[in-house]
């Protein structure tokens, strides 16, 4: 069982490493999104560089990476405690942030982390998504909405009594904020781009 779990965790890392924004940009738009906008491989920069259609596809793909990776023990009928689903999900987040297929320079893990939560705790995902969308509607800042959504997920998880989930969501929230430190500086300086489509 231990070997199988290790192998699934490695597979989850590989799944997380799929740079959907990079590949879609190169294949369909002949653009390397790392050379434009924020230079980030995530969904937000895909929206900024490639447009709403491509950005939406990248967002869905990045969410699915987290969801599929989290459910790997279920798909392979591995008889383990369901908390181990969070382990494979965590490896997908690591893969997205430090992708094997893109020089270990990845995204900020917001969508992939959301996919992990969607697979493990769907109601928590919905609650955090609502907070994200409301914040986005009011502020027009994707970065700020992502951070507030992550913090909301952490606060809500505290009432769920699942300490393994709480620890993972706390790590996700801290990591998301850390990855957005440049965005925080730009927001404070009034230099952070706002979305125009919402």
UniProtKB/Swiss-Prot annotation:
Membrane-spanning intervals of the chain:
5-25, 56-76, 84-104, 114-134, 158-178
- Protein's cellular compartments: Cell membrane
Keywords recorded for this protein, A-Z: Cell membrane, Lipid biosynthesis, Lipid metabolism, Membrane, Phospholipid biosynthesis, Phospholipid metabolism, Transferase, Transmembrane, Transmembrane helix
Identify the domain of life: Bacteria
The GO cellular component terms are: plasma membrane
Q: Which Pfam families does this UniProt record tie to the protein?
A: G3P_acyltransf (PF02660)
Report the record's Gene Ontology biological process terms.
Answer: phospholipid biosynthetic process
GO MF annotation, one: acyl-phosphate glycerol-3-phosphate acyltransferase activity
InterPro entries annotated for this entry?
Answer: G3P_acylTferase_PlsY
Describe, as the record does, how this protein assembles with itself and its partners.
Probably interacts with PlsX.
**Protein name as catalogued:** Glycerol-3-phosphate acyltransferase
